[in-house]
């Protein structure tokens, strides 16, 4: 990325990420939920956040629809705008990790290269890619917004899975079968991964 601003320097905080993590009692990380529209990314992200909140973790969900009401309101759905959308979200997610927070990002993010760029923004291990695996058929059946129908009729151009490709992760940290398993099973799978990684502490039996 080429910076358009000159004569700017990065100011280091006297309160470090480690300080904030110690205060919070858990590590910070990016949970990146990716998958087709209707795969259950946002629903799963909020369910995982609810579980983490009950464990007294500091969290925040960045949702693909919500972000387009503000930070990315100027972007459309062309390939170029999708790239910029994910770039902005990646930078925001990185700031959340510096704040000691577990950030849950729920975006279609259809292109591997864009997801890889976010991974490269943060130290190794800080980007946890969660592939919400559901078939196109299942996603269309769940389509309460009618987006797939509009996409197939040509009303919505560049729609992922119909007129624009989705590139599944090749080596995601977690694969959740949101097209087959229950929401509770998928959420527990994510929580157990975080506990095994030492990001959050195991709950008492």
From Swiss-Prot:
Stored CDD domains: APSK
The superkingdom listed in its UniProt entry is Bacteria
| Residues forming the catalytic site | 109
**SUPFAM superfamilies membership:** P-loop containing nucleoside triphosphate hydrolases
| A Pfam family reported for this protein in Swiss-Prot or TrEMBL | APS_kinase
One annotated GO molecular function: adenylylsulfate kinase activity
Q: State its Enzyme Commission number(s).
A: 2.7.1.25
Q: What are the transmembrane regions? A: none
Instruction: Please list the GO biological process terms of this entry.
Output: hydrogen sulfide biosynthetic process; sulfate assimilation
Gene3D superfamilies in alphabetical order? P-loop containing nucleotide triphosphate hydrolases
Residues engaged in binding ATP: 35-42
For this protein, what reaction is catalysed?
Answer: adenosine 5'-phosphosulfate + ATP = 3'-phosphoadenylyl sulfate + ADP + H(+)
Its annotated pathway reads:
Sulfur metabolism; hydrogen sulfide biosynthesis; sulfite from sulfate: step 2/3
Keywords (A to Z) from UniProt? ATP-binding, Kinase, Nucleotide-binding, Phosphoprotein, Transferase
HAMAP family reported for this sequence: Adenylyl_sulf_kinase
The family line of this record is: Belongs to the APS kinase family.
Q: What does this protein do?
A: Catalyzes the synthesis of activated sulfate.
Q: What is this protein called?
A: Adenylyl-sulfate kinase
- According to its UniProt entry, this protein's organism is Acaryochloris marina (strain MBIC 11017)
